[in-house]
C-alpha cells in the first residue's frame, strides 16, 4: 500500500463552463469539488439534476467541497470506519461534484474509472480518505469519484418528483464525464462505472436505465446489486412514515420547506420500518431504509437492458454481515442462524441445513454471519452474475476471503474489507489498522493490495481482471485472500438453495 511525500504544484484545466485549478503531486494531478450539476436547495433538492452554470475566473479545486447532508457514520458499534465516511457532512448546497485524479502524462487516451461510493444511500462521500484515486492515476487511469444526493433528497418517493434522484445524479455525472473528461486526459470512449455497496446498487440501476446507454463501457459491482430495491408500493410505505415523522404532507413544496438538519434527523426513524407492513421491526445493524425504487429489480431486467452486453466484474466478500453484526455485539453469546435466515426466506430451516452441510465446522455465530451476509449481498450478486452471463455479456466473478483479527476474530471478511486493497491504500492511514479498526492488527499477505488493485486496473484498461470468465459451463469464481484460487462451481449449491427457499 502506497503513499507519497512530494510537494504539490498548481495546475489548471479549461472547461466549457470555466477554468479550474487543481494540484499536481507525485506525477498525479488532483481536482476536487468540480461541479457536474447545479447546486440544490429548497424544493430543488427533490428535482432532477440541472446543468452547471458557468463562472468567471478560476475555480479553486485544490480542496474538497461540500458533501450531501448525512448523519455521522464514523463508527459501526465498536469499530472505527472513519476512513470510509469522513469527513461526514460538509455543509453547502454545491455538493453535486466530482473528485478527479489523473496522471500528469494523460493525453486524452487514458481509461477512465468512475466510482460511486457506498453508505446505505444515507452516508458517505467521494471525499472519504478511502476513495483517494491516486493509486489508480499512478497506474495510468483517470479516476473520478462522484458525490450524489443521499437520504430523502436522493431516494424518498415523493409525488410529483422523479424517483431515484441520487441515481439521476450519477447519470448526470456520467454525461459530464463524456463531455469533459478529455480535458483531464481521459478517454470518454473507455469508461468503467464502478461502485461498492449502495454504489454497486446504483451501478446496477444505471446499467438497466435506457437513458444511460453508451455512457459506460464496462462495470464493476462490489457487494451490491439492487436485490433489496423497493417496489413502488414499498417506497410509498417508507415515504408515508417519513412524512408522518416530520408532521407534514408528502409533497415537494412541504419537503422543500424542511431544513437539511430536519431531513437528516427524520431519516433515523426509518431504520426500523418493515417495508412489507409499515410496522416497526428490529433492523440489521441499524441500517436506514432508503433504497432505489424499481418495479422490477435490476437482476430481473439486466438481460433486456443495454448493460447486459458489456463486460462486468462482480463479487462479494465471504463474511459481508460481519460489519453489521460483530461490532454491535450481535454475534456474542447465543445466536440463532434459523432466525437469521428467516429474515430473508420462508424456508429458513432448509436453508440453514444447506449451510451446515457446506460448512460442517462452523458454529452458530459463523453460520449466522455467513447466512445474513449472503441474504444481504451474496445471493443477489450471484443471481445478477447469472442473469448478466445469460444475456451475453462477459462476466467475471470474485469472492474476497481474507479475514483480519478484528472484533476478536468475529468480523471476518466483512463488508468494506476489499476496499483498502482495491484502492492500494496507505496502510498507515488513521483509523485503518490497529485495535478497533477494520484491518485490525494482523498483517495481510504482502502482495494482496498490489494483486487486487492490479486486477481492477487491468479490467479498467480492457485486459480483464486476470482470471477466466464466468460461464454456464464453468461457473468460475476467483477466491481472493491468503491464497488466490479459481474455483469452478463455487457455492453453486448454496445459492441454488436460496432460489428454492
Please report, for each region that a protein language model flagged, where it lies by residue.
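Non-catalytic accessory segments of hydrolases
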Residues: 1-164, 431-452, 458-466, 494-501
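A structural signal for well-ordered alpha-helical segments within the folded catalytic domains
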Residues: 29, 95-96, 168-171, 175, ...
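C-terminal, loop-rich substrate-recognition/catalytic regions characterized by aromatic stacking residues
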Residues: 49, 307-355, 404, 420, ...
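Mobile gating loops/cap/lid regions near enzyme active sites that modulate substrate access
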Residues: 72-74, 378-501
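Aromatic-acidic/polar surface patches that form glycan- and anion
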Residues: 90-91, 163-166, 228, 232, ...
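Substrate-access "cap/lid" subdomains that shape
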Residues: 179, 213, 222-340, 368-373, ...
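Alpha/beta-hydrolase fold catalytic core
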Residues: 346-391, 395-402
Amino acid at each position: 500500500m502506497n503513499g507519497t511525500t512530494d510537494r504539490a504544484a498548481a495546475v489548471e484545466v479549461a472547461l466549457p463552463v470555466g477554468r479550474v485549478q487543481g494540484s499536481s503531486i507525485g506525477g498525479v494531478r488532483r481536482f476536487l469539488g468540480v461541479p457536474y450539476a447545479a447546486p440544490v436547495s429548497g424544493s430543488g433538492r427533490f428535482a432532477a439534476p440541472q446543468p452547471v452554470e458557468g463562472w468567471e475566473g478560476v475555480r479553486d479545486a485544490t480542496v474538497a467541497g461540500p458533501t450531501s447532508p448525512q448523519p455521522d457514520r464514523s463508527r459501526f458499534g465498536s469499530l472505527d470506519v472513519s476512513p470510509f465516511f469522513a469527513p461526514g457532512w460538509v455543509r453547502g448546497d454545491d455538493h453535486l461534484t466530482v473528485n478527479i485524479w489523473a496522471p500528469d502524462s494523460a493525453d486524452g487516451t487514458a481509461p477512465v474509472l468512475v466510482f460511486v461510493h457506498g453508505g446505505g444511500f444515507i452516508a458517505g462521500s467521494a471525499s472519504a480518505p478511502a476513495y483517494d484515486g491516486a493509486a489508480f492515476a499512478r497506474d495510468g487511469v483517470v479516476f473520478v469519484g462522484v458525490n450524489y444526493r443521499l437520504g430523502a433528497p436522493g431516494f424518498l418517493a415523493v409525488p410529483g418528483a422523479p424517483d431515484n434522484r441520487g441515481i439521476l445524479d450519477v447519470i448526470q455525472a456520467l454525461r459530464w464525464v463524456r463531455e469533459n473528461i478529455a480535458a483531464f486526459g481521459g478517454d470518454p470512449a473507455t469508461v468503467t462505472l464502478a461502485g461498492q455497496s449502495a454504489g454497486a446498487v446504483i451501478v446496477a440501476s444505471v446499467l438497466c436505465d435506457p437513458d444511460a446507454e453508451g455512457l459506460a463501457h464496462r462495470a464493476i459491482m462490489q457487494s451490491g446489486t439492487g436485490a433489496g430495491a423497493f417496489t413502488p408500493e414499498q417506497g410509498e410505505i417508507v415515504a408515508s412514515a417519513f412524512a408522518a415523522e416530520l408532521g407534514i404532507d408528502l409533497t415537494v413544496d412541504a419537503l422543500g420547506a424542511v431544513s437539511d438538519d430536519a431531513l437528516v434527523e427524520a431519516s433515523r426513524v426509518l431504520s426500523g420500518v418493515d417495508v412489507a407492513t409499515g410496522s416497526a421491526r428490529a433492523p440489521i445493524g441499524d441500517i436506514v431504509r432508503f433504497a432505489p425504487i424499481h418495479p422490477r429489480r435490476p437482476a430481473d431486467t439486466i438481460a433486456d437492458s443495454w448493460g447486459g452486453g458489456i463486460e462486468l466484474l462482480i463479487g462479494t466478500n465471504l463474511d459481508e454481515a460481519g460489519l453489521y453484526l460483530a461490532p454491535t455485539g450481535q454475534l456474542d453469546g447465543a445466536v440463532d442462524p434459523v432466525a437469521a435466515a428467516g429474515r430473508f426466506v420462508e424456508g429458513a430451516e432448509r436453508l440453514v441445513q444447506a449451510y451446515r452441510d457446506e460448512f460442517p465446522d462452523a458454529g452458530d455465530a459463523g453460520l449466522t454471519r455467513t447466512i445474513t451476509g449472503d441474504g444481504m449481498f451474496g445471493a443477489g450478486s450471484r443471481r445478477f452474475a447469472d442473469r448478466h452471463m445469460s444475456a451475453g455479456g462477459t462476466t467475471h466473478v470474485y469472492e474476497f476471503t481474507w479475514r483480519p483479527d478484528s472484533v476478536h476474530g468475529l468480523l471476518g471478511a466483512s463488508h468494506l474489507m476489499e476496499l483498502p486493497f482495491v484502492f492500494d491504500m496507505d496502510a498507515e492511514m488513521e483509523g485503518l489498522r490497529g485495535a478497533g479498526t477494520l484491518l485490525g492488527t494482523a498483517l495481510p499477505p504482502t502482495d494482496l493490495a498490489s494483486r487486487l488493485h492490479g486486477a481492477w486496473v487491468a479490467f479498467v484498461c480492457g485486459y480483464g481482471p486476470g482470471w477466466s470468465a464466468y460461464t454456464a459451463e464453468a461457473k468460475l469464481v476467483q477466491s481472493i485472500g491468503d491464497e488466490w484460487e479459481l474455483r469452478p462451481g463455487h457455492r453453486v449449491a448454496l445459492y441454488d438453495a436460496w432460489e428454492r427457499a
